[in-house]
């Protein structure tokens, strides 16, 4: 494990710029075709698959995803965001940042990163605001669950919109019962070349989204379920830690104004669901440790890709990889929020996730459930690699 990310892990060679990027993409076409043919023949024989328990389709799909990620890393592709609704239509909302006092400690504004306007997608639709409800309070008849979900993507990709998160959002809503709604913030990506938003922008956006649910929409925190997969789980658990610390430190005496005190006393959510969570960036940023991992060959996320994600969210000049908010596996804390932690038995993060669950369970008062799905790689729910 390492304390600081390697800046050289961020792709920056000739392939990341034009015309090199276009040339490399053209070269990649026959490369992918040849690899696909090779693996499609090789994996006919189950002993030759990365995991002998996998079906032919699982083995081939996992390897092709891994190949695609290698090419994405080689060209240094990152995603830029827009606040326009586009095809998302009336499921889309934009949110103004909260009062400056809501962002404190490590998530306070600095000269490089400040809270900003974000967008987000509701599934299946936007709930009524207090003004739209006749009694002006959180009075849904069924008191159904509201999920605040943070997508994966190594802080480099994805948006939470239907094209990349719709299937998972619908699956989550269905699993949590009738009437469930989920809100997927389009948090700022650290690889977005338009905004250049670095750490702690995604965490600031999580605070903005939570305040939007509780204060603007009047949704009781007892109805809110936090959820996150992979890097999204990093954000979800960071929000749990931050809100718990906020409530401990907040008091009327240190509030600047009455509205400030209300923000500082945001109640904690009901539960936090984490799927294949990235809870140890000091491990993910260490390429040599990942290459030695027992699941290195069965996961589609390779060592250079993980190191890139770690370096992107944690530039060494700004934050350490072993920061409590980036490597919470090393810093268990007491929380009344129930924690559910899932990992795949064939993913690189499997042992890290199991260790984190054990440490958090050992804290008196914590309620932690750990589920390990045998023979599955990273973030299996999002990538649909299961049979």
Q: Where does each model-flagged region fall?
A:
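Gly/Ala-rich beta-loop-alpha elbow adjacent to hydrolase catalytic centers
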Residues: 228, 232, 236
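Alpha/beta-hydrolase active-site loop signature
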Residues: 154, 187-191, 279, 377
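Conserved alpha/beta-hydrolase
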Residues: 172-192
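Fold-level signal for large, globular catalytic cores of enzyme and receptor domains
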Residues: 149, 177, 193, 212-219, ...
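Short, surface-exposed "cap/lid" segments of acyl-processing enzymes
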Residues: 119-176
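Extended, polar/charged low-complexity intrinsically disordered and coiled-coil segments in eukaryotic
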Residues: 1-142, 281, 308-311, 340, ...
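Alpha/beta hydrolase fold serine-hydrolase catalytic domain that processes acyl esters and thioesters
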Residues: 17, 21-24, 204, 218-225, ...
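Alpha/beta-hydrolase active-site loop
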Residues: 196-217, 238
